[in-house]
Curated annotation (Swiss-Prot):
Quaternary structure annotation from Swiss-Prot or TrEMBL: Forms oligomers.
Sequence similarity: Belongs to the MraZ family.
PROSITE patterns (alphabetical): SPOVT_ABRB (PS51740)
Residues of the SpoVT-AbrB domain: 5-47, 76-119
One annotated GO molecular function: DNA-binding transcription factor activity
The name this protein goes by in its record: Transcriptional regulator MraZ
Pfam families given in the database record: MraZ
This protein's GO CC annotations: cytoplasm; nucleoid
Keyword flag Repeat: yes
Localization terms from the record: Cytoplasm, Nucleoid
GO biological process, one term: negative regulation of DNA-templated transcription initiation
Organism, as annotated: Staphylococcus aureus (strain NCTC 8325 / PS 47)
The organism's taxonomic lineage, starting at the top: Bacteria, Bacillati, Bacillota, Bacilli, Bacillales
UniProt keyword terms in alphabetical order: Cytoplasm, DNA-binding, Repeat, Transcription, Transcription regulation
InterPro entries (alphabetical): MraZ (IPR003444), MraZ_C (IPR035644), MraZ_dom (IPR020603), MraZ_N (IPR035642), MraZ_sf (IPR038619), SpoVT-AbrB_dom (IPR007159), SpoVT-AbrB_sf (IPR037914)
Length: 143
């Protein structure tokens, strides 16, 4: 399970260190792709297989299903950690998520998310105000 928030930087070659707490669970190779809210999603290979199976159940007769699958899968790439614990983020994904230098990597249960730091900070501030209301609307159990 992935959790936590870590600040890192992209180097000039588009490489970024993956937090050490995430590396063990991700293994040496994992998948990154376009996420929602202008971030990147990162999945273990096992989790990615489960997502693929779920996506196969989407009705191809629905235009939005086709559109979503095209965007999601066309952006997917398998990445490999180098000896320094870095991955190379392709230019098309850096552009999609507006990743330039300062990044934030967060753990979200079954995936990691890679954000432009300013975009993450804006999202966090906006969401922090409504966190309790969202919990009340969505969660039907105590924790």
């Amino acid at each position: 399970m992935f959790m936590g928030e870590y600040d890192h930087q992209l180097d000039t070659k588009g490489r970024m260190i993956i937090p050490s707490k995430f590396r063990y669970d991700l293994n040496e190779r994992f998948i990154i792709t376009r996420g929602l809210d202008k971030c990147l999603f990162g999945y273990t290979l096992d989790e990615w297989q489960q997502i693929e199976e779920k996506m196969k159940t989407l009705p191809m007769t629905k235009k939005d299903a086709r559109k979503f699958m095209r965007m999601f899968f066309s952006g997917a790439v398998e990445v490999e950690l180098d000896k320094q614990g870095r991955i190379n983020i392709p230019q098309n994904l850096r552009k999609y998520a507006n990743l330039t230098k300062e990044c934030t990597v967060i753990g979200v249960s079954n995936r990691i998310e890679i954000w432009d730091r300013e975009t993450w900070n804006d999202f966090y501030e906006e969401s922090e105000e409504s966190f309790e209301d969202i919990a009340e609307d969505l969660i039907d159990f105590d924790f």
